[in-house]
C-alpha cells in the first residue's frame, strides 16, 4: 500500500494513456495500452486508497475487457485527481461511466471490432444530454440514496 502511494503519478499516467489512446489492433500501440491497463488494475488492487464497485447495471456493456480497463482508468484518475479516497462515490460512478461512453463513441469502430459492448442506451442518453441524471438515478437505485460505497469490488456475473 505504501508503494502505491509512491507510484500515484505512474498510475495516473497509465490511466490517462488508456483514456486518451485507442486500443488499436497493431502490436506496438496495443502492447503499451495493455501494459498500462495491467498497471492500473494492479495499482487499484494493491492500493488501500481506491475502492471501485462494478454496478450491476454495467453487465450489459462491461463484457468487454477494454471497456472495463477504461472504467478502471477513469476511476483511478478520478480518485487521484479529485482525492476521492476509500469510497466508490456517485461522482466517481458518473465520471467513470461517462468516460466509458465518450471513449466508446470516439473509438466505436475499433471497440465494435474488439468486443461490441452494448452501449446504445448510454450513448443515446449522452447525446441527449441526459446521461449524468440517468447515472445519478442509477447509482441511487443500486446503492441506496446515493451513499458512497465502502465495500470492495462487485464483479459482474
Where would I find each of the regions flagged by the language model?
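Immediate post-signal-peptide N-terminus of mature secreted/exported proteins
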Residues: 1-37
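Mature extracellular/secreted ectodomains of secretory-pathway proteins
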Residues: 28-142, 146
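Non-catalytic accessory regions used for complex assembly or targeting
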Residues: 1-6, 134-157
Amino acid at each position: 500500500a505504501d508503494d502505491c502511494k509512491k507510484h500515484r503519478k505512474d498510475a495516473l499516467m497509465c490511466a490517462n494513456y488508456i483514456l486518451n489512446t485507442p486500443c488499436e489492433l497493431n502490436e506496438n500501440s496495443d502492447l503499451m495500452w495493455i501494459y498500462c491497463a495491467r498497471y492500473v488494475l494492479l495499482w487499484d488492487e494493491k492500493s488501500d486508497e481506491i475502492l471501485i464497485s462494478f454496478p450491476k447495471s454495467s453487465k450489459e456493456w462491461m463484457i468487454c475487457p477494454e471497456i472495463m480497463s477504461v472504467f478502471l482508468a477513469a476511476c483511478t484518475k478520478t480518485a487521484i485527481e479529485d482525492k476521492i479516497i476509500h469510497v466508490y462515490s456517485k461522482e466517481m460512478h458518473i465520471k467513470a461511466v461517462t468516460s466509458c461512453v465518450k471513449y466508446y463513441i470516439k473509438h466505436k469502430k475499433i471497440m465494435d471490432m474488439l468486443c461490441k459492448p452494448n452501449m446504445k442506451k448510454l450513448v443515446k442518453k449522452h447525446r441527449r444530454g441526459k446521461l449524468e441524471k440517468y447515472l445519478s438515478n442509477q447509482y441511487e437505485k443500486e446503492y441506496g440514496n446515493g451513499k458512497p460505497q465502502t465495500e470492495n469490488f462487485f464483479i459482474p456475473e
